[in-house]
Amino acid sequence: SSRSVFNVYNNPDLLQVYNYPNPFSDNTNFTFELRGTTPPEEFKIKIFTVAGRLIREITPSSPLQIGFNKIYWDGKDEDGDEIANGLYFYKIISKHGEEVKTVTQKLAKVK
């Protein structure tokens, strides 16, 4: 008798992560695709200066879905102040059970 083995990936996978516009002047949207059977239990986007200082943490305002998602950012820091022109990094953190996926990319503010 033959036996077939296959894997079922239930945990969400994070793909096609980018922000547009990039560079941006006032605001930008983070877009990404989630694959799997259920969305992550925890999801956040952290924005850092090039020196590594956390200036903003964004959580989705509505539940994420399997497929394409978009999260808006107003270009402001935690205090509600507009960020200065320059280069920044954003880190997307997706948690599902014990599994954590992260993606880090650059974004630029130009006015």
Which residues fall in each region the model found?
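Glycine-centered coil/turn sites that cap beta-strands in beta-rich domains
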Residues: 7-20, 24-49, 57-65, 69-70, ...
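C-terminal beta-strand of the catalytic ATP-binding
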Residues: 32-34, 75, 92, 109
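C-terminal tail/sorting-segment detector
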Residues: 2-10, 17, 81-111
